[in-house]
Amino acid sequence: MARINWSVLSGPRVSRRTLLNLAAASGAAAYAGRMAIADAALAPPSIATRRAIRQGEPKTGGTLNYGFGISQIPNLDPAKVNLGVVAGGILPLIFSSLVQFDAQLGLIPDLAEEWTVSEDGLVYTFTLRDGLTFHNGDPLKAEDIIFTYERAIDPDFASPHANKLAAITSAEMPDDLTVVFTLEAPFAPFLAVACSRGPGRALTPVSPRAFEEMGAEQFDLAPVGAGPFSFVAEGADLSSGFQLAAFDGYYNGRPFLDQIDVTIIAEPSSRISALEAGDVDMLDIVPAIGVAQLQENPDLTLVQSPGTSWLGLAMNWARPPWDNPEARMAVAKAINREDLIQTAMFGLPTPSIGAIAPAFAWAYIPPDQTETPQAFNLDEAKALAESAGIVGAQPTIMGTPDDQRPAEVIRNQLTDLGLDVQIEQLQQAAWNERWLAGDYDWILNGSVADADPDDGHWNFFFSEGPWNSYKYVNSEVDALLLETRATGDQEKRADLYHQIQTIIQQDVPHAFLYHTVDTTGFSNDVQGYNAVPEMRFLETVWLDR
């Protein structure tokens, strides 16, 4: 196999085709077919509801009313945000990072106008744009990137994303516009998971002066970044709503909108009603229950993109009998995913057999092309339940309002297994606290707005992963995950992820359920929206009013 030349990851643009060439250089012929599928899957997003998009000169001004589907945003410090919906739907509005994604999940410049990667994959050199500023007027220089890095790795700060920076052995600034990161070993997803706008929360630049003057707790609630919109602290409430103001100093030109009013709407049905009534102009994510209904509304446009997420039912290994693999497998095999998708999600998602989302087609294997021990088989599930002694058990599914429908379907299905499943619905902040503390029997969760399969695997299935609150430990999986981070050969990475998938299917840290389709919706007078899967970039949006 030829030696990998990591320098092809240098910017100012890294396309998916470059990733193909990287693999081809190592003789990965079979990868070409998968990349063709990936190119098709990540073509510019389809307009699910076909409307004539009015052409014309963008208009400046106005306020976009943005309905955001969550009960409460716990915090907005990018290095602390642990909810993918917030990372994808809010952070890209307030923060810029070194690089960003295009619609095909290729990498393009953001704060860094270009970057180079050494042939051995160990040295990343970023050249910042000249004249960058934070929202508070402070200049953004290389020293601020260094501050952001040092803050994220500080054990006292306790960023859940510090692991994405663990490979860095030195961070240097030869001058005000140059940042050099040296890694101890190649880290394949470094640009995507550490340096990108939205998912790359670990290195998303924040204002040092604002952080030091405000303190960590206040900065959580009113952050200062360098993105297209600044956070308006006055009157802000992360449980009800807040305002974002167009940033005149944004490097790519002031956004067309004057303001974005973010309204927190917890209940899915309330979100749908708000969009139809015109109370909001846009929903970050259209609930599955409302997609068909909104598609029929001639005043609305829906845009769909391939999802990068997965959802599963996690069973807490620290709470018997769910430490018993037979008990977990019994539950996994008793869930009819096709029925779950049709009944709870109106047929929109695709069944999941693991944590590799369809958007990552270079590694994704459709369920009908492989076998999984978690496949629905009620007879086998009943035999396992009897053997494990769980008939009559009363586990509780902990969820949020968005989880109610799938939780109810799962509860009903598992009555056939002799389980009396309870449902506990919590608002987001309480759910988040108990999730991270491992204080639950079962939980519906998974990864959202992934920049690379590393996000949805390392965080959940590495023994020390930040989201592994159900205490899953498998040394073989740990070793394979470390290996995925160290290789630049996409075919090799895909094979490693397939090995991991086989193991976690059998271990059942999650009963894997489905992959969602990313659907956003807005009124027809919202123009200029550029869709990137599970991320919201709104600086190009304007209102035709």
Feature map (PLM): residue ranges:
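N-terminal secretory signal peptides
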Residues: M1-T18, L22-S26
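Ligand/substrate-recognition segments at binding pockets and active sites
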Residues: Y66, A236-S240, A361, K382-A449, ...
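N-terminal lobe/hinge region of extracytoplasmic solute-binding protein
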Residues: G67-E119, E150, V224-P228, R536
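Gly/Pro-rich hinge or "lid" segments in bacterial periplasmic/extracellular proteins
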Residues: D102-G106, R197-P255, Q259, L378-D379, ...
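Surface-exposed binding/hinge segments that line
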Residues: T127, N163-A210
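Ligand-site clamp/hinge motif
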Residues: E217, F247-Q293, D420-Q422
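Extracytoplasmic/peripheral linker and loop segments enriched in polar/acidic and small residues
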Residues: E326, Q374, D420-W431, L436, ...
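Structural transition elements
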Residues: T350-S387, R405
